[in-house]
């Protein structure tokens, strides 16, 4: 039996690690060459700079690594996201370098509209909680924009419909930012377009739009999924330029419809909302002009009738001018007579004052005299001012000379030194008085202290609690006592509880015999 087992092991095919890994790879790829796997996206990383995306598909019991190559990513109808439930179509393969397996995805689609709707509702709740859908933050559209920016695909019927509708209603300048409106990069391109239009300067070479239209034709939920991107919704909400959302048909809705300032049912409807009808405006202006002209004419006719009525109430011009004409004639006559009289008077005065050389010489001398007197007065006043200013400068120079300043400094220094000496004397006297008071207090304390009494040979008796015993009646036989002397304390025990009665008076001055002396305790 043992020999058979040994022979069986010897006859088993021997593989190298590379051979067995290759055999497993071929087996897996042959058996699972085309599979559909349903799971939740986990650990989504991508697309990387290479264009590939790596993640895992998982359920509640297992996990499967997955990869989407660059070419497949560009064909996807939606952008994969973390937590999204999808159905992946592809083939299983192994990676011999790490002995693991993965699915290479050829197609990826959401696991039904329910999964996308659940994700969309979750985003909607989050953005609504932040107030991005509030009507109070939405801006009014300009009535007549000069430039409109359109974010859409450069090909297709959407851009043609918008431009055609604007041209029919009110031709103006249209800027088109071409983007993809479907696929994995659609949301990023539309986001960049919205932020790019907002980054344009008002006085730049490219005219900044007054209004933005983000448009796309109709489609399924998966086709419109790029317009449900959270980053795009936030960019539209933060736009400084009013935005009209025109994505899909009237029954479709996306996140940017909720954050945009106005939602149009269709791209054509967005163009109709964006600009008024030029013919209607012209008709309105013509009507208003006619009404204004009629109002002006009516007002003019009223004023003319009022002027005519006032003219009829006024007297005739001849009656109004008769009195002023008479006054003018009288004034003219008086003026002529007055001029004649004045000329005659001036002529007579001139004849009476002949300009002889003597007269001219006298007048010149008088003028010289007056001029000399005025000049002398001016010189005297000038020199007086100069003397006063010199005296003022001299007084100022005297006050600012070094000698008075030095004297003032010396006086202040002497005063300060005298004050310092007085302060020292006051402090010394104060200290001496305080020392005397301290000595008196010390002597009084010594006099009143029981230490002085103890120093004269007395003792202070205390019980065990430290209380002073003042009477013999307070002593009990056997009581523990403490005797305090001037140089220390001693413990003692009372041998009797009553003291001897004190004699009323001494019978004689004879000293007692030593044997008759009573006990202190």
Curated annotation (Swiss-Prot):
Compartments where located: Cytoplasm
The reaction(s) this protein catalyses: Exonucleolytic cleavage in either 5'- to 3'- or 3'- to 5'-direction to yield nucleoside 5'-phosphates
Compositional bias per record (Low complexity), positions renumbered to this chain: 498-508
The organism's place on the tree of life at top rank: Bacteria
Keywords: Cytoplasm, Exonuclease, Hydrolase, Nuclease
Region described as Disordered: 494-521
GO cellular component terms, semicolon-separated: cytoplasm; exodeoxyribonuclease VII complex
Principal subcellular localization: cytoplasm
Protein family membership: Belongs to the XseA family.
Function field: Bidirectionally degrades single-stranded DNA into large acid-insoluble oligonucleotides, which are then degraded further into small acid-soluble oligonucleotides.
Subunit-structure text: Heterooligomer composed of large and small subunits.
Protein name: Exodeoxyribonuclease 7 large subunit
Species in which this protein is naturally found: Mesorhizobium japonicum (strain LMG 29417 / CECT 9101 / MAFF 303099)
